[in-house]
């Protein structure tokens, strides 16, 4: 009951309270006499889909940054908005950001291949993976979500002194590209309580790893290790990819006859990876839906692009999904994060598919 009350308050509280502001940054003063961007039917569906679970569902209109739904379930404290206030490992959903970045650097190409036989060994360390054919190229590595491929690709990027003579420069450039896609910092949503996640840079790794190299931090390649994101950031990343490289600050207010959305919220942010790299990423996300980890959301009426994640956790793993639809002229980007939900393909992915179908097809 507390969860239901919280999500209802998320929709109506902005009308009941005089002014919200993000006090720490002092960025926004949000008046209350303007309508919300939330789609009531979508919000209701997302609420029902998360019933009895702990986690969040977020949907964004990629063309505007408007929040279409934002649901947070918390079994312990319903006052915490997990969509913007909780930082998690993104798991394999992070591989799409890796792909766009490493492609633009020239560290990989669409033809790059790595072997995987239920994982791989390096320096006595085993990276596990599920069974699939081997070797894989880039599009297949996204579609099949191969852990071995992404760890080897990231390791080789970090250790490639021909590409980057100084490893710190390599990691700092990587960090900058991730930041340009809205990762590792708060996005500036017009709600209080947003946290920024974590994308490590060279200074952070120097402090925490003491003599790091590609092998010791290769976990970052598959979205594990120190990387942390919020569900809102994952949804925004899906919007970045849907737009082939740009995004708008996610926001929950829209214009009315008496109030205009803060111009800060309508600025178009351009990410650093190339448009061509995003097209290849989208091809991989389509492969995931056609014959990879996202087959549960194939739809005969429109083309869906998706990426699953299974985020390692001390207890049961978290189930993660992010995606958008349609492939051309996208209307909705979605992220789903279910704590202790297991495989992303089994739970978060089908939930995300239902959210997209409701918005596009109205059912």
Describe these PLM feature segments.
Residues 1-7:
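Positively charged n-region of N-terminal signal peptides that target proteins for export
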């Amino acid at each position: 009951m507390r969860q239901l009350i919280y999500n209802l308050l998320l929709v109506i509280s902005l009308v009941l309270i005089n002014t919200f502001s993000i006090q720490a940054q002092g960025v926004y003063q949000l008046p209350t006499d303007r309508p919300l961007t939330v789609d009531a039917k979508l919000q209701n569906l997302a609420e029902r889909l998360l019933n009895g679970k702990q986690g969040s569902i977020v949907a964004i209109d990629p063309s505007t940054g408007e929040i279409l739904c934002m649901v947070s379930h918390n079994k312990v404290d319903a006052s915490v908005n997990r969509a913007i206030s909780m930082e998690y490992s993104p798991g394999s959903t992070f591989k799409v950001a890796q792909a766009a970045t490493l492609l633009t650097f020239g560290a990989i190409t669409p033809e790059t291949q790595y072997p995987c036989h239920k994982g791989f060994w390096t320096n006595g360390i085993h990276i596990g993976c599920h069974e699939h054919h081997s070797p894989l190229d880039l599009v297949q590595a996204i579609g099949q979500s191969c852990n071995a491929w992404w760890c080897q690709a990231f390791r080789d990027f970090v250790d490639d002194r021909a590409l980057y003579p100084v490893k710190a420069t390599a990691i700092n450039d990587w960090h900058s590209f991730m930041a340009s896609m809205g990762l590792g910092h708060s996005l500036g949503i017009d709600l209080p309580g947003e946290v920024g996640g974590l994308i490590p840079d060279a200074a952070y790794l120097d402090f925490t790893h003491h003599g790091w190299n590609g092998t010791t931090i290769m976990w970052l390649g598959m979205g594990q290790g120190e990387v942390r994101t919020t569900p809102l950031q994952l949804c925004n990343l899906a919007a970045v990819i849907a737009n082939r490289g740009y995004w708008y600050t996610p926001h929950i207010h829209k214009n009315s006859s008496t109030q205009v959305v803060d111009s800060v919220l309508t600025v178009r942010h351009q990410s650093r990876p190339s448009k061509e790299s995003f097209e290849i990423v989208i091809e991989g996300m389509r492969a995931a839906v056609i014959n990879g980890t996202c087959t549960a959301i194939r739809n005969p009426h429109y083309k869906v692009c998706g990426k699953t994640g299974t985020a390692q956790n001390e207890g049961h793993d978290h189930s993660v999904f992010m995606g958008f639809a349609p492939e051309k002229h996208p209307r909705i980007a979605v992220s789903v994060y279910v704590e202790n939900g297991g495989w992303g393909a089994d739970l978060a992915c089908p939930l995300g598919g239902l959210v997209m179908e409701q918005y596009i097809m109205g059912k």
